[in-house]
Amino acid sequence: MTKKQRALEIIERLKKEYPDAGCSLEYDQALLMLVSVRLAAQCTDARVNIVVEKLYEKFPDVDALADAPVEEIEAIVKPCGLGHSKARDISACMKILRDKYQGKVPDDFDELLSLPGVGRKSANLVMGDVFGKPAIVTDTHCIRLVNRMGLVDGIREPAKVEKRSFGRSFRRRKAAISATDWYITEERYVLPEPILIAKNAVSVISVKKSVYKSWW
């Protein structure tokens, strides 16, 4: 079995095992996802969802967040940890969205990367889940799993894993498979290993032994 065939087979098995998988971050617009992924660093999605709801109640749009004192943002996001740096990034990011992008979240990967507090992992998450574009959220958990599954060979650098994975034919929309079918989160369900995603953009599921035991 080629690596391309293995990748497609893995995704198909996971889609059958978890047909209703979904992203655990709650959002109904690009702005909320952008804020959520910044707050999610070293924090659970469940707590992020609670905090973002409170933040959005007080500051319901880009303009409100851009004008808000950093101290007020920090007071709300503090339960997520790293409150000062996260509040500072959110404030700076909202100012750029207001002044450069007419209050809209850009759907271009490089433009997302230029925003304060947005790295490759966050940019890929927004690109895949919000805009439905091919994207791979590559973190240490993803790297460990794709190496274990044999989809990459001993590659540990996130950017290289991302690039190599894009070459595995995840772009085949007709087969309902794209690079956005992969996402790793630190939450754990069945295994003490991180969860693997396999359903459109960033659908969160845990990998059961019955699903993957024959992959390596």
Write out the residue ranges for each language-model feature.
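Catalytic cores of DNA base-excision repair glycosylases
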Residues: 2-216
